[in-house]
């Protein structure tokens, strides 16, 4: 493509460093985009409020209601992608991995403790706390894109 920038790919970051960047973006901006695929192979993308838990490296967590469509989607097609970005778009991190629907009460409590206060919109839609499930994305691959520097970092976990 004529005039397209030639982004250099660097592999200087390791999995811990890229997850630290994901955590920093989440802590500052509170949201990320989750892309899933439905039973017909059609893509769906939505904003969620995720968290990175220090005791559980290499994973991204979110809360959902068991009746929401994304639960059926990830059970049928567990490969997903998250995107995190700064408001100025000077840093964009995309993370791919396999997602699990976890119904472990202690993990649910741990995730809720971290992100529960940030879930105002979610609580309007999910009325029954007994229906909550944890989405655990086990990260397999990440790309950190710094468009203003023409730089891309690729990390395999």
What are these regions (language model features)?
Residues 30, 46, 56-58, 76-80, ...:
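A generic structural signal for short beta-strands and their flanking turns/coil linkers
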């Amino acid at each position: 493509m004529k005039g397209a920038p030639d982004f250099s790919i660097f592999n200087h970051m390791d999995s811990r460093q890229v997850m630290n960047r994901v955590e920093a973006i989440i802590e500052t901006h509170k949201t990320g985009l989750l892309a899933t695929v439905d039973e017909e192979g059609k893509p769906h993308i939505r904003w969620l409020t995720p968290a990175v838990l220090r005791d559980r490296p290499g994973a991204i967590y979110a809360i959902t209601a068991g009746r929401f469509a994304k639960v059926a989607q990830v059970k049928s097609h567990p490969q997903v992608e998250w995107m995190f970005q700064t408001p100025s778009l000077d840093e964009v991190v995309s993370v791919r991995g396999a997602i699990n629907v976890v119904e472990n009460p202690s993990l649910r409590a741990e995730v809720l403790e971290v992100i529960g206060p940030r879930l105002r919109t979610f609580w309007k839609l999910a009325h029954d706390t007994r229906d909550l499930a944890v989405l655990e994305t086990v990260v397999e691959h990440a790309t950190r894109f710094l468009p203003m520097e023409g730089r891309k970092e690729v990390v395999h976990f």
